Amino acid sequence: ISDGLFRKEVPAYDKEVIRELVCNSLVHRPYTVSGDIFINIYPKKIEVVNPGLLPLGVTPENILHKTVKRNEHFANLCYALRLMEREGSGYDKMYEIQLSNGKQVPSVTEGNDSVTATVERRIISKESIKVIQQALQVEELKQKQIICLGLIAQNETITASALIKKLNLRDRDALSPWLDKLVDDGLVEAVGQNRSKEYRVSADILKNSEYKGTTSLKRIENYRIRELIIEDLKIYKSA
């Protein structure tokens, strides 16, 4: 992706993400269940299909947080060989990479006797790539905060409840380590009050990242809306 001095190479599929998915399928599959692992390559996505079901207590919704050990020694070996992230952090890493590349996070679906993990090829937000790069130039962010910023950047505005749902968190307190530093550091703005409060990337970050995405009245400050109305009335006096 090139825009003036800004340039970032975005692969169709990040090798770390694919490697993590394949290693996960090998390490976390139930070997008491027969069947092969399938890697299905389509023009717009890659699927890794695993025989068996997710470990007890793990669901497609809580897979970002919930860890249940299965084939522990195999997992430790793959981690020691640097083939995969330590147990419990693989999906965090994949979320970070996908969002930093302006793509959707991996999706997981559970069938009757198999689990399918899917990564999409399509970039859904080029602008969010620049937003995250600009934010990392001005602040040191943890993985959780990069993930949260990526989700916010891919949306014009988003509520805390929507973030909680996307991240499968318990409540607003659980969201704090993901979100609060972004607001405190001025990377994200909070608009509204209480339950109607929404979050968006700050105007300074958008400006410095040379944001060229679509903008609606939600993103324009009140004083700018007033100026636009006055200017419009000057042009169209008869109105």
Question: Language model features by range: what are they?
Answer:
Residues 1-239:
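C-terminal regulatory or interaction extensions
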